[in-house]
Amino acid sequence: VFIRHTHLAQEVDEDTFFHSPETGGTVVSTALDEMKRVIKDRYSPDDWNIYGAQASDGDNTSSDNERTERLLTETILPACQYYAYLEVGREGEHFPPGFARRHSDLWQTYARVVASGAPLAMRKVNHRRDIFPVFRELFQKKPAEAA
């Protein structure tokens, strides 16, 4: 299932997700609301193992961060086996040595969720081309722990 969003979210096919540009304000909670709807309508956690993956530039309307955190912790993560968030830097954005890009408000919101012990993995990449390799790493089968 592919969900894209700006200030509104919608489920789209894979080709549209990857190749149809969208612009506009960013309200992340709309995508989480859409994921909640898809889970409720078609993928009950009683019948499916649900894995979520989110890639973002980190932009979110600041007034939406609290709602995003609440949806993630109260609805999305309890329905998922695993959830990964990947934040992509802006292409061509460079910082002098010793300077780093400030954590986005969305990154800080999700970091609070991780700090609470939630099953959420977070990574940053510098380029869109790095998205799939990092998602592959995050979702690779982990060796079983010794009992």
What are these regions (language model features)?
Residues 1-52, 59, 86-88:
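Von Willebrand factor
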Residues 7-9, 59-60, 90-93:
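Conserved nucleotide-binding/hydrolysis micro-motifs of P-loop NTPases
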Residues 11-16, 62-66, 95-97:
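A short acidic (Asp/Glu
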Residues 35-42, 64-74:
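A short, acidic, amphipathic alpha-helical segment used as a generic capping/interface helix at domain edges
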Residues 49-64, 88:
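DG-centered beta-turn motif at the end of beta-strands
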Residues 71-147:
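Von Willebrand factor type A / integrin I
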